[in-house]
Amino acid sequence: MLAGMPSLSHEEQQEAVERIHQFMSEGMSSGEAIALVAAEIRERHQNDPQAMAIFEDTDFDEHDESDYRRDNEQDADEIEDPYEG
């Protein structure tokens, strides 16, 4: 799965491409058409157990870096490097 999109069969991929081309032939920009078809696909696969959540950067804004550390190990910039001159 890429970018939060469920895995699609070849037939589903072809249908998506055809929908995108249809929207574009009606005057919609390629970006808008792709976004619309992607939203439709996500909606159809909303309860799909194979669909994986993709997190936005803002999901982690409430946490400090220390929230993600597993131990008290020093940061790399705190370790003395014997090879530095």
From Swiss-Prot:
Disulfide bonds: none annotated. Transmembrane segments: none annotated. It holds the Pfam family UPF0181. Residues 74-85 have a biased composition (Acidic residues). Residues 1-22, 57-85 are annotated as: Disordered. Residues 9-21 have a biased composition (Basic and acidic residues). Belongs to the UPF0181 family. This is UPF0181 protein YE1782.
